Regions:
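Hydrophobic alpha-helical segments and their helix-loop junctions in multi-pass secondary transporters
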Residues: 2-11, 51, 141-158, 203-241, ...
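Membrane-water interface regions at transmembrane-helix termini and the short interhelical loops
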Residues: 5-23, 72-79, 93-104, 153-159, ...
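Transmembrane-helix boundary/entry motifs in multi-pass membrane transporters
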Residues: 18-37, 70-82, 106-138, 160-162, ...
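N-terminal alpha-helical transmembrane segments of multi-pass membrane transport
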Residues: 1-67, 85, 207, 211
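Select transmembrane alpha-helical segments in multipass membrane proteins
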Residues: 30-38, 87-91, 122-138, 170-177, ...
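Membrane-interface loop-to-helix entry segments
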Residues: 1, 128-136, 142, 185-212, ...
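Membrane-interface interhelical connector segments
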Residues: 232-247, 304-337
Length: 337
């Protein structure tokens, strides 16, 4: 994170990712929509609603204080500045490689050419690319394993389907592949249209929950409190390692998330760098924080505090439901209802 801020405000921040005087291909909104949907969108509905529930029963949260004070802080910490700093630092590096150096081979080995030299095209470069492919497969599998069952559960409950959840999962994956292929065949234009559609639906959902969910005051006040607590304790949260392993919280959550974001660094930064042609390094980094981090924070503040508000006001008991069944997908469906 500190490295990204240094790059943005140093002399390197004025470097244009492209030819001198070249203008961005996309408007800020379209560019931000594409960046956000490529970075976090697949998992964000799942974790926005439910992550605080998983934290609420963790001994570390009880050590720190109340559920009200801390259960909503860690989602903001885990999903905001640090993951986006991973993406954005690499995005400007790849953007420089693609648009300034004109090296159009989007491979990790190509990014290592200044270090590997002639060995980039030999077995060291191939090993790097192979590891990147395995990392991408692991990240994709993790994302689909979280997002697809949730969609299947919602569809099954909404339409009262009697077929198995596995069959619905397969259908969803097939439809996803078709939509993805269609978008790719139409290039970045197709991807931008799909991203715009997704972002309109997404912010429409947030507006609906905030305005008509009955928890608006709680959402805003708790959200501001959690955001302030996260900013105030950012360094401590970032460096906590639980050396005595009293709860294993950073190992189970913080380090897991960092590893997950690093896995997606084999793909997301290449895409962000590709669509950032014509923007300066500073615009790419700060714009990424404004749109990427801003949208992420709003999502967790609205959706997470909506479900936590229902819990705190005695309207529902999601903590007891999760402790009894362990079914986060069914719990999220009940939250949405």
């Amino acid at each position: 994170f500190l490295l990204s801020i240094y790059i943005a405000f140093s002399k390197y921040g004025d470097i244009v990712l492209g030819e001198k005087g070249e203008k961005p291909r996309y408007s800020f909104f379209v560019w931000g929509s594409m960046m956000f949907t490529c970075g976090l969108a697949a998992d964000i509905l799942f974790y926005s609603f439910s992550e605080w529930v998983m934290y609420a029963s963790d001994p570390h949260i009880k050590e720190m204080g109340s559920i009200q004070q801390w259960a909503g802080v860690y989602p903001l910490f885990h999903w905001s500045l640090i993951p986006w700093s991973f993406y954005l630092v690499l995005a400007v590096a790849f953007g420089f490689m693609l648009h300034v150096r004109k090296r159009n081979r989007q491979k990790y080995s190509e990014a290592c050419r200044p270090l590997l030299g002639k060995y980039t095209d030999k077995w060291p470069g191939r090993i790097i690319d192979l590891l990147a492919v395995f990392a991408l497969l692991a990240g994709t599998a993790t994302t689909f394993s979280v997002a697809t069952p949730l969609m299947a559960t919602i569809i099954q409950d909404l339409f009262h389907l009697t077929v198995s959840r596995t069959a619905i999962n397969i259908v969803i994956l097939i439809i996803t592949c078709i939509v993805y292929t269609y978008s790719l065949l139409h290039g970045f234009k197709g991807i931008s249209r799909l991203a715009n559609l997704c972002i309109y639906f997404f912010f429409g959902l947030l507006a609906f929950v905030l305005l008509f969910g009955g928890q608006a005051r709680y959402i805003i006040e708790t959200g501001l409190n959690s955001l302030g607590t996260m900013v105030e304790n950012f360094i401590g949260l970032s460096t906590f390692t639980d050396p005595l392993r009293s709860t294993n919280f950073p190992q189970n959550w913080t380090i897991y998330y960092w590893a997950y974001w690093m896995v997606w660094c084999v793909a997301a930064p290449f895409f962000i760098g590709s669509i950032s042609k014509g923007r300066t390094v500073r615009q790419t980094i700060l714009g990424g924080y404004v749109f990427g981090v801003g949208s992420t924070l709003i999502s967790f503040i609205v959706l997470g505090n909506y479900s936590m508000g229902l819990q705190m006001h005695g309207i529902a008991d999601f903590m007891a439901q999760y402790a009894k069944t362990g079914d986060l997908y069914g719990m999220i469906v009940d939250i949405i209802k």
